[in-house]
């Protein structure tokens, strides 16, 4: 049975756990050092001037702490925060209700901001730039627009697909911060801290083993920790040992590099079914039985980071590392992507 660890949003229990372990001060936020150092300067300067912080765009793969940092920004600014997500803002009226309820210096956090409808996005432009919105009263021949001033606020947008933001929206963010994957050593510290909050002990080498297979992502590390706790408790053990950690990871089919069943299926399909590529994302999604957006947002970034996959103008291409691990040479006949022993040179540009 396949257990989803990567492409499932946090459930209620996980959300409560994330709230428990969520730091509330910038100095307690682990990792992303350059990003947080810069934000400290911008926040301090805004507070010294008595201004609202410039609008902030937080981008990067899921599970790296974008939502956590949005709440920390509000805490550091001493401001209230209202949170929503792009898909929920399906009408301009929904956004107008949020904007008119903001007080001076408040934070409006929009997760998945790239999924806002274009009409709603355009409604944000004047709000972000001039702190005003236009509201339509009545309809038909008697319709008229009324301009309302709103209090200066800070929009914090989070996205896993910054390339899908329109240029006008992206240009209105004064602060653009990109999240990177975490190093295993830092994830080990995060796991040890989280285990103490969970109320279960963990051996350092067990924490390190889990960290090394967490794809550089704190959310995945915490999910694996909770599953390891389950195995330990069922076995009547009060501390997660390396043996328990290994048992957990093996049962969940998480390998030494953090690849799960779907990662391997994607790479096996590209290497053996499509002879290494290039293959378009639509064809790949149909072949592996996964949503296109999920492949692009969840699986591809790490496969590229791990050196297995490249995106080119013609499609997805497997790398030499991918062939060395996944190639079935009886199918390929010694050819690498149909190039007789050598991989094509590829660029890093986006493909459809």
Curated annotation (Swiss-Prot):
It is found in: Cytoplasm. ATP binds at residues 21-22, 63, 66-68, 129-131, 172, 182, 219. GO terms for molecular function: ATP binding; ATP hydrolysis activity; four-way junction DNA binding; four-way junction helicase activity. The keyword Ribosomal protein does not apply. Belongs to the RuvB family. NCBIfam families: PRK00080.1, ruvB. Homohexamer. Forms an RuvA(8)-RuvB(12)-Holliday junction (HJ) complex. HJ DNA is sandwiched between 2 RuvA tetramers; dsDNA enters through RuvA and exits via RuvB. An RuvB hexamer assembles on each DNA strand where it exits the tetramer. Each RuvB hexamer is contacted by two RuvA subunits (via domain III) on 2 adjacent RuvB subunits; this complex drives branch migration. In the full resolvosome a probable DNA-RuvA(4)-RuvB(12)-RuvC(2) complex forms which resolves the HJ. The RuvA-RuvB-RuvC complex processes Holliday junction (HJ) DNA during genetic recombination and DNA repair, while the RuvA-RuvB complex plays an important role in the rescue of blocked DNA replication forks via replication fork reversal (RFR). RuvA specifically binds to HJ cruciform DNA, conferring on it an open structure. The RuvB hexamer acts as an ATP-dependent pump, pulling dsDNA into and through the RuvAB complex. RuvB forms 2 homohexamers on either side of HJ DNA bound by 1 or 2 RuvA tetramers; 4 subunits per hexamer contact DNA at a time. This is Holliday junction branch migration complex subunit RuvB.
